[in-house]
Each structure stands twice: as C-alpha cells, then as structure tokens.
Amino acid sequence: MARNVEEPAYTVVDTYALFEVRLYEETIQARVRTDGQHYSNATGGFRRIAGYIFGGNQRNQRIAMTAPVHMWAEDGAHWMAFTMPSSLSMEQLPAPNDEGVSLVPNLAGHLAVLAFSGRSHPEKVAKKSQRLLDAVKAEGMEVAGEVVLAVYN
C-alpha cells in the first residue's frame, strides 16, 4: 500500500477467528458498470473511473486517488468503484464527462471483512467470498447485500 493514500474511515466493532466487523463512515463513490463475467475483466471500468479522477470531468479537475478499488456483482452486472476523498462533498465534486460514471453516496454501515493477500483471480475470490459468508453465518449473523472485493495495490 502506498503511503499518503486515503482509505475509507472505519472502526473495528468486533473480531472473530476468520473475520472482523467494521463500522465504515459514509463516503462518496465514483461507480461504473464493467464488462465481463469476472473481476479480472474490469480493466475498462478502471480506466473509465481513472479518467474521471485524472481530469475527465466538467471542470478538468484532478481528484486524488484513494484505496481500495471496490468490485462486486449485483443484479447480473459487475461494478467497480473508487471512493472519493473525504474532503470533497457531493456538491464539490465535478460531474463526470463519461455518462457511465456515476457519483453515488455510500451510506455508513457495518461490514464483515476477511482480509487476504495476493492476486484476486476469480477462483480465489469465489473461495474467499464463500469462506466469509460461511464464517458470518456460523457466528449467527444475517448476511445482507453483496460481497464486495476491496483491492489494494
């Protein structure tokens, strides 16, 4: 992880053998629907959002890169998101030039997190996702929402 790269703020609420529960603060994300059936095919989505933060917006404004890059599948589509710097409000963010890039509030909430390292190939992501879901259910918790892959460089 590079130094001086902002990450979403959170508090660890509880720690279990295989995962921890974190309470994340509200953020704003730049999101795009990506092509392909797997996270590994998301290069086009990455380029589109990177284009937005590197000045592809109505003010030609550069926006600081944050970590991680979020990827998930929902309703038969794959999505990618970059979290916007916490110093910028929705009103301060310039509109994207690319109509496929949307600025979306990401509400505060609790997330179960299973950290792992290495490449995020589809088989590994599927295995880790299932392991997380099984561990959460084994602790008697209800799963709500989709599994989100958070990729750090």
Predicted regions and their residues:
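A solvent-exposed interaction/effector surface
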Residues: M1-N153
